[in-house]
Amino acid sequence: MAEIKHATDTNFEELVLKAERPVVVDFWAAWCGPCKMVAPEMEKLAAKYEGAIDIVKVDVDANPGLSRAFNIMSIPTIAFFKPGAQPQGVVGFRPLEQLEQQFGLAEFEVASPVSESPESVTAD
């Protein structure tokens, strides 16, 4: 299973701002119903783009400094940080397909390995 990292006020810069690859950040809280709907979408993103995009979650209640720094007024807020570009964000639940379209993630998609069928494998 692909790894979803958890950022704090102290490690956010390292995990997100200094990351060498793009990062999708889920700003959430345990009491937030729509945030619970976003969690499976983040898992799908992590699996689909493993090795190409990092997924990071930020608990806004435990990390108020990040909430202030990024002006998070509503949750869930999902932000896309691409090295060398301004972050983009959306508020509220979005299914995987909408997140991919909103943030232009198709360019980062990792090709699935092609498995050979038993008929196409020849023995020497």
Residue ranges and their predicted role:
Residues 74, 79-114:
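Non-catalytic, surface beta->alpha helical segment in thiol-disulfide oxidoreductase systems
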Residues 8, 28, 54-56:
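Conserved Rossmann-like nucleotide-binding pocket used by diverse enzymes
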Residues 4-23:
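A short beta-strand-turn-helix
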Residues 20-21, 28-31, 74:
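Short pre-active-site segment immediately N-terminal to redox-active cysteine/selenocysteine motifs
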Residues 58-66:
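Structural microenvironment flanking redox-active thiols in thiol-disulfide oxidoreductases
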Residues 113-124:
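Short acidic DE-rich linear segments
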